[in-house]
Amino acid sequence: MLAVAILAAGKGTRMKSCLPKVLQPLAGSTLVERVLTSCSGLQPQRRLLIVGHQAQEVQQQLTDWQGLEFVVQQPQNGTGHAVQQVLPVLEGFDGELLVLNGDVPLLRPSTIEHLVNEHRSSGADVTLLTARLADPTGYGRVFSDQQGRVSSIVEHRDCSDEQRHNNLTNAGIYCFNWKKLAAVLPQLCSDNDQGELYLTDTVALLPIAMHVEVADPDEVNGINDRCQLANCEALLQERLRNYWMKEGVTFTDPASCTLSEDCQFGRDVVIEPQTHLRGCCNIGDGCQLGPGSLIENAELGHGVSVLHSVVCDAKVGNEVAIGPFSHLRPGAGIADQCRIGNFVEIKKSQIGEGSKVNHLSYIGDAQLGRHVNVGAGTITANYDGVRKHLTVVGDNSKTGANSVLVAPIVLGSDVTVGAGSTLTKDVPNGALALGRSKQLIKNGWQ
């Protein structure tokens, strides 16, 4: 049996933020949710989140995580004190306890699984994750024999000059035999510079301590301030881009683009500079995104181009051209082979197959049929000051430039709207609609 305890009680004062540190965003998710996701594949029997500072906010953020148990640490008196709070919660539990940190979000699931498997196969009381750092200054050094058995952990300030040449460091991630740990946790003391109880001290109290070295030291990067947050964001973004490039996606300027882990791409997608994908995005084969575009929680079919545009909570069919400077807002649905052009905004509207909204238009709360041509400057006046109303335009209809369709209104199929018209009444199939004043010329005006 396996229980997981995630340490998430710290104040994170160096963040200088109103937001709890573990709720800081990283590539579209929070730090602590990334840690929770990384260990989900182990299917632990118990998942404990140790909270303290702004505990209520952390709990509210994680209400959708079924089976997650919250353990409150008050006051926050070190990592050992945090795990002591688990003692009554896991009374009678017989298995392993995996201890993770809520501010170490880059751990791969495979690394965690390897740590747990090695711990189980070795029969150790504790197995700690270690990392070899190019610059280990400030980190505790781990000393072990060739079989990986840990003899001691020495804090940097206590190391001799010779010991400081050892670059094997403690990553602060452990897998314990829970019963053995529970027996020694009460023995921890706060006889140190910080006056806190350190979980590290349990290693010296347990007879058999082993270690597993992480292959990529970047996985155990902790986050304490905005600089480290930015560094982890860059590392995670590079990891995501490299994965998708190996899957057939082209980034013409990778470092200028960002993704979320919930993005999915078909083959031969080209992502141009300064293009950002957030949330859950599903991008079909052969799409060209950017430059300078934002796509969020959107579904794009095959062969879609998005140039200098924003697509948010929208669904787009195949072979659609969007932009430049278009804005597809929530509820926009664009069918196959449409053209959404310069400075066009579409909100909560369905645009039928082959239709074109090419220039300077606002289409809101509307249903456009197939092969509709919307003239430059056409506006659906959907709001009466109290409620939004629907505009319906039938197949093969077209509006002239600078037309206003005052909703609620229905235009039938094959309707033509004269340029400059303001329409307030329904138009039958095949009709010409004109709603403008007669041109008046007064000669000799000046």
UniProtKB/Swiss-Prot annotation:
The keyword Transferase applies. Residues 1-226 are annotated as: Pyrophosphorylase. Mg(2+) binds at residues 103, 224. Pathway: Nucleotide-sugar biosynthesis; UDP-N-acetyl-alpha-D-glucosamine biosynthesis; N-acetyl-alpha-D-glucosamine 1-phosphate from alpha-D-glucosamine 6-phosphate (route II): step 2/2; Nucleotide-sugar biosynthesis; UDP-N-acetyl-alpha-D-glucosamine biosynthesis; UDP-N-acetyl-alpha-D-glucosamine from N-acetyl-alpha-D-glucosamine 1-phosphate: step 1/1; Bacterial outer membrane biogenesis; LPS lipid A biosynthesis. It catalyses: alpha-D-glucosamine 1-phosphate + acetyl-CoA = N-acetyl-alpha-D-glucosamine 1-phosphate + CoA + H(+); N-acetyl-alpha-D-glucosamine 1-phosphate + UTP + H(+) = UDP-N-acetyl-alpha-D-glucosamine + diphosphate. In the N-terminal section; belongs to the N-acetylglucosamine-1-phosphate uridyltransferase family. In the C-terminal section; belongs to the transferase hexapeptide repeat family. This is Bifunctional protein GlmU.
